[in-house]
Amino acid sequence: MPNVRFSTRFCRKCLYSSLSVADMVRFVKMVNPNYDIYKRSGYPDGHPIATQDAADLITRDILQDGLYVDFVETLIKINSEGYMGRRYDLRGLDDVTGDVIQAGYSYDKTTDQFFENQQERITRNWGRLLDGDERQMAVMRLDIAGNSILVKENSRNLIEKAYGDLRKIVTKSIVSRLGRLWSWEGDGALGAFMLGNYSRMAIISGMEIINEMVLYNTTGNPLKSEIKLRLSVHSGNITYSSSETECLKADIVRKAITLESKAAKPNSLVISESLAVTQDQALLNIFSNTVTVSTDKYRIYQVSQKNE
């Protein structure tokens, strides 16, 4: 999303009315470690810079570098948590946040992150992530059980219709929980979640998809056989890439794929025990069934259909 839509006047005022020049530089280095206000401004090293001038320079530079939203997120965190044991009261920060929202972003209070307004656009990077950015996320792997048999037994037109319906169901469930559909293959998909309680969002999305497909099999499936899905959810750190191929190489994605292939059954969602114990008891009660593969333990949610 283009930075030119930000007015930045509220940010400049917030900086010069709340922080010293040293603090401004310290905080901008949290999003751009190589930032040098003297090199960027042309001032001789060590030359005194007025507080308001420093605020203008830093805001201009961080905007040019495409890191303005990251900087605002940093200010929000410092205002709420402090820095190095010191509390900061950043005056006018609500106006700074409002300016970003006015520019077309939404704000997630759970993770203190801005993301694109889903009423205007939906992109795989939430309108924020750049290649190399690291985030904590949950990923959901989906596989169509018995895909080759379905393709063999049904006409191409019917397969395209049914799989198109499946994609709509999956996309709606993921996006409605602030996730993104990262890949869609002939027999599977990958969803990513990084906002709100992202692990729970991914798990609930997977459960919803399974139940929606059970209903679809009963009321709208044009194929000769039911469409049965195997799903898994795993969470952890990931380095974002705009390349779908590179994303599939990420450790948490590979673990989700392994989890699905090893432990998931048709019409089931599997999560690792390490992920399960981070969830609330109400959700754990739903995942009361456990499976063990080799030495690994998993929790499984499964829905039975009429002919099972």
Predicted features, each with a name:
Residues Q118-Q119, V139-I144, L181-E185, I227-L231, ...:
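Short hydrophobic/aromatic-rich motifs at helix boundaries and adjacent loops
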Residues N117, I159, E246:
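Short, flexible loop segments at the rims of nucleotide/cofactor-binding pockets, characterized by
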Residues Y83-R86, Y105-D108, F115, S155, ...:
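Short, structured coil/loop segments at alpha-helix boundaries
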Residues A54-E134:
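Regulatory cytosolic signal-relay segments
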Residues R86, L90, R177-L178, N217, ...:
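Long, hydrophobic, amphipathic alpha-helical segments used as structural scaffolds
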Residues W126-M201:
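Catalytic NTP-binding/metal-coordinating core of nucleotidyl cyclase/transferase enzymes
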Residues N3-Y68, M194-E308:
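Catalytic beta-strand-to-alpha-helix segment of the class III nucleotidyl cyclase homology domain
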Residues V96-A103, V151-N154, A192-M194, K228-S232, ...:
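A broad, low-specificity signal for short, low-complexity segments enriched in glycine/proline
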